[in-house]
Design a protein with these regions (language model features):
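Cytochrome P450 catalytic domain signature, combining two hallmark sequence patches
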Residues: 103-123, 417-419
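Conserved cytochrome P450 K-helix/beta-meander segment immediately N-terminal to the heme-binding cysteine loop
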Residues: 387, 406-434
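Cytochrome P450 catalytic-domain helical core, especially the substrate-recognition surface
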Residues: 2, 56-69, 117-202, 216-273, ...
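Conserved cytochrome P450 catalytic core segment spanning the I/J/K helices
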Residues: 184, 256-321, 361
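Cytochrome P450 catalytic-core helices
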Residues: 317-342, 456-457
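Cytochrome P450 heme-thiolate "Cys pocket" and heme-binding signature region
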Residues: 147, 308, 313, 355-356, ...
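N-terminal targeting/anchor module and adjacent flexible "hinge" preceding the catalytic domain
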Residues: 1-104, 121
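Conserved cytochrome P450 K-helix E-x-x-R motif and the immediately C-terminal K′/meander segment
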Residues: 69-76, 238, 352-394
Length: 457
């Protein structure tokens, strides 16, 4: 049987079998390439000597699934308990659970040593804020923000912060009917932190405490978290070229998400413009960012982007830490009683509680540290790409261009480094000899190095 193609010049008969040759060749080539890639990743890849699941060594799918499973932090811990402190969790990706790893990956590099770059798979380039900027711009942004996060700045900002804390306490009394009704503390902590950071960033709050609900912008942040996780997992698969992915992502997002994102970018710019138009020198983040230093100043776009990132990075993380502390104090009444006694024997009235005076509450500080160990606000990691020439991480040489990471939750719950890691015990931070072997140096909830959290103080 054949296909007859005719024209004025000639008649050509093409066998049907030949018409199937091209797709068949593509299938055979694709299968052959997949088999070759599996063999290469298992036996010839530069990371072949590192332990881990065989499927993870040949495919990125297991790690992408781990990212969207909702229990990735526990899965990563299980992998480290099975394979050791270094696990190959994807073909070119190493996960570390070792006390030295975080400093080796994110710590200060020696003079002349290149910085480990942000993971290019999930990190966009040319971002105009302190989170995603390159080394030079990050230094410039951090310098512009430094005064806004200094100890003196916190003292100057205390009246602003205290106003919202007092409003929070008043709202809690009112909505809990003086402690007789249950309330959602996670929401109320978020109301307060978003109002505080909003005021310090834009000169006005979001009004969450007053309205007892989330501002639409704040609500969008929570609604989009899952979508961003799915997008990150899709990027990690690297099935679609990055340039093409950037084009199709807006169409793959839930309906209206791109529009809302653009709208909120517009609102952020509007809030920054409104704050700048006041000409105020109040002790907030915007005053710090707009103060010229050594002739340097930030563009309007940089001001807008950094102010917006402060809202996300400074609000939800703080609320998460406070929520964790409240949750575990509720689970462990003996710890709650000790903390209550410390506070009530230290202060005679609420007016005595200040940013300076609370620094002497040793048990309270231990409670906060233990809460962040048990439930770190950044439970997963911030991947890096090893610099040119490779690096020694946790005592092992890692080739250049390897994605490396430390997940905080698995590290903080690893029984190799912590006594009773799954128990909430603030005393471990107060010199109790029972916990003398805890590797407290690996407790870095604010990260470490030149890109550690500027709000650590």
């Amino acid at each position: 049987m054949g296909i007859l193609i005719s024209n004025d010049a000639a008649k050509v008969v093409i066998p049907v079998k030949l018409s199937l040759a091209l797709p068949l060749a593509v299938i055979v080539f694709g299968f052959g390439y997949f088999v070759w890639l599996c063999i290469y990743n298992l036996y010839f890849h530069p990371l072949r000597r590192f332990p881990g699941p065989k499927l993870a060594a040949i495919s990125r799918f297991p790690y992408s699934h781990l990212l969207i499973s909702g229990k990735g932090h526990r899965d990563v811990l299980d992998l480290h308990l099975k394979y050791g402190p270094i696990v190959r969790i994807a073909p070119g990706f190493l996960s570390f659970s070792h006390p030295d790893a975080m400093n080796d990956i994110r710590g200060h590099r020696k003079a002349g040593q290149p910085e480990h770059r942000k993971d290019p798979i999930r990190q966009e380039v040319h971002i105009q804020n302190i989170i995603g900027a390159n080394r030079a711009d990050h230094t410039r942004f951090r310098r512009s923000l430094a005064n806004g996060f200094s100890h003196q700045a916190m003292l100057d900002q205390e009246p602003i912060i205290s106003e919202y804390v007092n409003e929070l306490m008043k709202s809690l009394e009112e909505h809990s009917a003086n402690g007789t009704q249950q309330i959602d503390m996670v929401r109320w902590f978020n109301y307060a932190t978003f109002d505080i950071i909003g005021d310090l960033s834009f000169g006005e709050s979001f009004g969450c405490l007053q309205s007892s609900t989330y501002d639409p912008w704040v609500q969008l942040i929570f609604n989009s978290v899952k979508n961003l996780v799915y997008i990150g997992a899709l990027k990690h698969l690297q099935i679609v070229p990055r340039r093409l992915l950037k084009f199709i992502l807006p169409y793959a997002m839930p309906k209206g998400l791109s529009t809302k994102h653009a709208e909120n970018q517009r609102l952020s710019a509007m809030k920054v413009r409104k704050r700048l138009d006041t000409g105020s020198n109040r002790p907030d983040f915007m005053t710090s960012m707009t103060t010229k230093r050594n002739g340097e100043s930030l563009t309007f776009e940089e001001l807008t982007s950094n102010a917006a990132i402060l809202i996300i990075a400074g609000s939800e993380t703080t609320a998460t830490a406070l929520s964790a502390a409240a949750y575990y104090l509720g689970l462990f009444p003996e710890a709650q009683a000790k903390l209550a006694q410390e506070v009530r024997t230290t202060f005679n009235s609420a007016e005595d509680i200040t940013i300076t005076s609370v620094q002497h509450l040793t048990y309270m500080l231990a409670v906060l540290d233990e809460a962040m160990r048990m439930y770190p606000p950044a439970a997963s990691g911030l991947p890096r790409l090893t610099a040119e020439g490779g690096a020694t991480i946790a005592g092992e040489y890692v080739p250049q261009d390897t994605i490396v990471d430390v997940w905080q939750w698995p590290l903080f719950h690893n029984p190799n480094y912590w006594t009773q890691p799954d128990d909430f015990i603030p005393e471990r931070w107060l010199g109790d000899p029972k916990f003398a072997n805890d590797r407290r140096e690996c407790f870095q909830p604010f990260s470490t190095g030149p890109r550690n959290c500027i709000g650590k103080k």
